[in-house]
Structures are given as structure tokens and as C-alpha cells.
Amino acid sequence: MDIASKVEGFPTLGILYYTSTLLAVCTYAALIIISIPKTGPASLVRYSSPAIVLTVGKQLFHASYGVSGSLAHRSLTLALTALFILQCCNFLVLTRLDAKDLAKKNIFQDSDHMIYKAYRVVCLIFNVRGIGTPWQAKHLCGFPRFYQRGKGRGPTPIWFILRQSLIVAWQCLLLDIIYTTSMSTPKEDTLKLFGEGTEYMYLDANAEQWTGRFIAGIIAWVIPGRVSIDLPHRVLSIISVFLGFSSPQQWPPLFGSMLDAYTIRGFWSTFWHSYCRWTLTTISSFICRDFLRLPRPSIVERYLNIAFVFLGSAVVHMAIDSFCWGPPMKTKLPTLAFFGSLVVGIIIEDTIQALCRRITGEKRRDGDDGVPVWHKLVGYIWVSFWFMMTSPWYLYHNSRLPPDDTWLVPVSFVDTFGLDTATMLLFGSGVILKFAIGIEV
């Protein structure tokens, strides 16, 4: 798809409708949160509000389908929409936050005007990682050492915007090359590697199909998957800081280092983005502790909590897939199986680590300190193996989508200057950025 067709088909009205509706439903939830008590007759309005929020959320899902012609853009928009809607419901009926609670947490002051209070609650709903609040997600990656050069103790707006802009340009070039390369692959080769049913081939898979598993299980996560989610986050941070809506300190890196992904647990808790963590852990904690009343701490509560988090993530991703891909809708059980397998993988690795500690008498380590290199190497092999076995269940469908649905950036440098030139520029600029501004790995 060329840029002219993308510009002609730019859904301005659809984006305005989606944005205004999202702001309206979040503002409605915020007003209920700060004005309706948690108990008493009036609380019925609070506890019935999720029905309205979820109904509008369904309409937002339909509206967000037309926000972009790119699967990656639609998927991220739908994912964030789902999280915003679920967060509204969390605040209303699960954590049951009210004006007093939020004042105690320094979200606003009791003396603030109601309009400002509503604004702060809407910002909290959009702040799905809880940055700068008591609910901030654990294991967030700190700011790069680049910002500590000289006498600096943190990012200044100018350096933050400059660094983010350079990385965004480099990421756009990377995604452009990936898309162009994938489109140049003959259709028969794509079908051979990622065709219907190949995700379930193991013993009878040939070397080329195992290469496809390596691409889907490892490369797809750490390069295009990571970058396609990270790029919009950086763009939003540039706009927000440039317009003065927020400070650079409110935009820590979205992803951690891939070097920390030597366990499945570490992959999701330390390396991968934490967009879903606050929302889904709130729901899982409510089910395990308030509804099922499981003792805490206990093994059952710990792993059932993890299971409900990944189940919630699976449900969100299945809903996204249904709206992104459109009819005819195929079964989404492979997606459910993939996210469920992660729970099994975490239980396996926790069990093996516990047995090793019992045999050797070694104490459990907190964090990354003191982990031997050979432990990490074994861990990388383990995580790679598990993702190669299970990721195709979830990711192979993307490779079967039509080309017009899989573009990643609106302007193609490759189409203008050629793939060879773009590739040389990518590697050359990547080395420069690594040493000049400390681009993350």
C-alpha cells in the first residue's frame, strides 16, 4: 500500500469519534468515582456504572477497528482501549476508590475543584502503569545512564525529546525494512513456513519450518513485536512532554533489557511492557483473595493468581483478534492455549529452581544480583525453547494476513532509496545511536 492511498484513507472523523467517546466514558467514570460514595443507597449508581462503561467500551471496540488500516496499530489501540475500560471498572467496583482514598494517595487535594479532580482521575485511568503513584508497576526499567552524564540526575525535556525522536526515526526505519523484507518473500515460501497447521507440527517439521519457529518464537518478540509497541509509546511521550502535559520523569522506558529474560517469569515481569499488569493483577487479586478467599501467602493463591492474570490477558487478546481480523472469525483457542502454557512454564521453572536450591542449600536470590552466567545461559535456552514450542499457536496467523493489513509505518524510506541503502543506514545509525545516546537493548 503506497502513501497516497494511506493519506486518502486516513480516517479523521473516525479518530475524532473514537477519541471523544473514550474521553467521555472515562470522564463519566471519574465523576462517579469522586462524587458517589462506596456505601449507602447512592452507591447503587456506582455499582451499576460498569454496565454503561462496558456498553460504551464495546462501541469503542467497533470504532477503533476503523482507526487505522494497519493490524499493528489497530491491535495496540484495541488493547489500550480494553485496559482503559477495565481500569474504569476496577476503580468503580473492585478497588472501590473514592475521593477520600485518592486524596490520601495524593492524586489530588480535598480542596481542589471538582473539575480538576475529575481530570486527575482520568489521567490516572490512562496511566495504566501507575507511573508516579502508589500503584506503580514493579520492576520498571530505570532511565538510561545517558541522562546521568555530567551533572544531570534525570532527563531534561530538551534531551528527552531529542533522544526519543532519534530512536523513533531509527525504529521506523527498522520496521520499514522488516515489512519490505517480509513482503518480498514468495507466497509459496510463506505457506511452507507458516501455512495452516504448521504451528502444530513438531516431529514431522523440517529444518525450514523449525527456522520459522525460531523466527516466531524469538525474533518476532524481541524485534518487531517489541519495537511496534515501543514506538507509539515514544511518540506519545514526545508529544506530551513537548506540549507540557507531563514531565520526562513520567515516561520511563516501556521495556526492560532482553538480557533479563532468562526465565519466563522474568520475560513478562522485567523485560516485556507492563501495560496490563496493574489492571489484570487487580482483577486476579479480587478473585483469589476477596471472592475465593484463598489464604495468603500460599502456593495455591500464588499460582492461581498468575493463572488468572494470564487468562485475563488471553481474553483481552482474543477480543482484540476478533475485532482486528474481522469475519469469518476462527477459533481463538490457540491464543488461550498459548497464554495458558505460560503458567505451566512458570510452574515448571519455579519447581526446578526450588529443587536446585534444596539440593545445593543455596538461598533464594532477590533480583538479578549474583546470578551466575551459566545459570542465565541455561535460562536463555529454556525460554527460547518454550517460546519456540508455543508462540506459533498465537503468532502464525499474522503471517497469513493480506499485505495491505500488515504495514507498520506510513512513509517508506525503503521504497524511495532501496533496501540496501536502508539496511546500511540502519546498521550505521544504530551503532552511532548506541554509543551517542545509549539506545536500549
From Swiss-Prot:
Entry GO terms, CC: membrane
Signal peptide: none
Pathway(s) of this molecule: Sesquiterpene biosynthesis; trichothecene biosynthesis
TM region(s), chain numbering: 14-34, 75-95, 158-178, 306-326, 336-356, 377-397, 421-441
Protein's cellular compartments: Membrane
Any one GO molecular function term: O-acyltransferase activity
InterPro entries: Wax_synthase (IPR044851), Wax_synthase_dom (IPR032805)
Keywords: Acyltransferase, Membrane, Transferase, Transmembrane, Transmembrane helix
One example of a Gene Ontology biological process annotation: lipid metabolic process
UniProt topology in membrane: Multi-pass membrane protein
A Pfam family the protein falls into: MBOAT_2
Family annotation (PANTHER family): LONG-CHAIN-ALCOHOL O-FATTY-ACYLTRANSFERASE 3-RELATED, WAX SYNTHASE DOMAIN-CONTAINING PROTEIN-RELATED
Family, per entry: Belongs to the wax synthase family.
Comment field (misc): Trichothecenes are sesquiterpenoid toxins that act by inhibiting protein biosynthesis.
Protein name per Swiss-Prot or TrEMBL: Acetyltransferase TRI7
Protein species of origin: Fusarium sporotrichioides
